[in-house]
Amino acid sequence: MATLRIDRFTVDPADTEQLLARRNALVAAIRDAVPGLIEARLVRLDDGHWIDMWRWDSAASQQAAVAAAPTIPEAAAAFSLVGNHTTELAEVVDER
């Protein structure tokens, strides 16, 4: 069953370009390290928060990525720019 990891955070507006570049590098590094990432979608809300949604083919793939993240330099680089970070995990139960 597909799962979503949903990260909500803030970023200094001056760091937006850097965030986008580092996130792109992180997505590529995760895809190289762990199979199963279906899509990664980043949105900016009207209130200035960002939401990064990563869709995985299974909970096992998502958990493998979380376990691998500390060994992936791009993860530390991307997360060094964010503040007020929260994470939620969700199971996809219906799609139309």
PLM features per residue range, with description:
Residues I72-E74:
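A common structural junction motif
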Residues M1-P70, F79-R96:
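Short S/T/G/P-rich N-terminal loop/turn motif that feeds into the first structured element of a domain
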